[in-house]
């Protein structure tokens, strides 16, 4: 942890990691049986690349504001050949740097109405393809992007996007190609994603926000100092109650390949805050992944929790001590 923290400090100073530093991180993780999987979130969540290369966006401008910790509503243009050539090169380079079999391409929170719907290039593409909705452009967009992943012998991962705020995935992406692994994350919509992926044969990773988002505060009053958009509270006990199979039969959850805790960094100042937010809830998520609900025991978990937390603190790792359950252990 200290070594990774040093890397992060250097990254903030130099604004990037070299390929050699990245290789060292990957090796450090591999020695601890951790696989590092890269993610490129497209076509939304692209404010960083659009700040550097604004011509890739639907705004068709040469300058864009540089915004830190915000996603804004910017998106890549679906009808711009430079977008595809740039990302083909990026995916090729990432494939050579990361030994993982997977590359995550995102696909979530695409604000299509403010971009592709109003973009003259995208509208021309819609007309050519006979599409009625701009969200249908996700079909050719991801067809090409997924092919770039596959031509590098990698397996693509996408977020399972079903929220009505954004064009739901079943408007344009279901059935996903069967070799695409999906991640369920939208709070309250996991059962729908679980059923759709079972029906269409996609491997599924479970990371529902109401249980597995480690950037959410652990207790009321423990909200981050900045970039807090009104996050809900996810207590340790709530994380421990996570049932990855959501009560369905073993057969209907057989396509679930694991669980994932997500720790988004826009409200995380440093490595100490990161580990503070992750632990002890990461212990609860781990147990959710390897222990069936019928064998889960909250009282047993609490008894096993404190020795592990004590051991981490002795090693200088910042953790949150769950004082609210201390008198009940």
Predicted regions and their residues:
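Flexible, acidic glycine-rich loops studded with aromatic residues
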Residues: 158-163, 169-329
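Substrate-binding cleft of carbohydrate-active enzyme catalytic domains
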Residues: 20, 25-158
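Residue-level marker for well-ordered alpha-helical positions
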Residues: 6, 142-143, 191, 306
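A short, Lys/Arg-rich alpha-helix, primarily the initiator
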Residues: 1-14
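Residues that mark the N-terminal boundary/hinge immediately upstream of a DNA-recognition element
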Residues: 7, 18-21
């Amino acid at each position: 942890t200290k070594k990774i923290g040093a890397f992060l400090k250097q990254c903030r100073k130099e604004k990037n990691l070299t390929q050699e530093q990245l290789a060292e991180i990957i090796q450090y993780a591999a020695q601890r049986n951790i696989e590092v999987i890269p993610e490129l979130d497209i076509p939304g969540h692209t404010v960083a690349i659009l700040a550097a290369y604004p011509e890739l966006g639907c705004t068709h401008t040469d300058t864009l504001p540089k915004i830190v910790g915000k996603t804004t509503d910017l998106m890549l243009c679906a009808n711009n050949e430079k977008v595809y050539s740039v990302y083909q090169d990026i995916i090729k380079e990432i494939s050579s740097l990361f030994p993982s079999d997977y590359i995550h391409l995102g696909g979530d929170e695409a604000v299509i109405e403010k971009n592709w719907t109003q973009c003259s290039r995208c509208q021309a593409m819609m007309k050519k393809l006979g599409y009625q909705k701009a969200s249908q452009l996700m079909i050719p967009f991801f067809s090409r992007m997924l092919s770039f992943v596959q031509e590098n012998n990698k397996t693509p991962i996408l977020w399972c996007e079903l929220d009505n705020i954004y064009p739901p995935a079943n408007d344009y992406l279901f059935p996903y190609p069967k070799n695409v692994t999906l991640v369920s994350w939208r709070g309250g919509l996991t059962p729908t994603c679980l059923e759709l992926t079972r029906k269409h044969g996609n491997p599924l990773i479970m990371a529902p926000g109401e249980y597995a988002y480690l950037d959410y505060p652990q207790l009321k009053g423990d909200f981050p100092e900045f970039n807090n958009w009104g996050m809900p509270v996810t207590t340790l006990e709530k994380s421990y109650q996570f049932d990855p199979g959501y009560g369905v039969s073993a057969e209907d959850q057989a396509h679930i390949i694991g669980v994932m805790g997500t720790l988004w960094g826009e409200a995380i100042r440093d490595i100490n805050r990161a580990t503070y937010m992750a632990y002890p809830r990461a212990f609860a998520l781990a147990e959710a992944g390897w222990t069936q609900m019928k064998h889960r025991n909250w009282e047993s978990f609490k008894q096993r929790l404190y020795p592990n937390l004590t051991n981490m603190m002795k090693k200088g790792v910042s953790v949150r001590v769950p004082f609210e359950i201390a008198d009940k252990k």
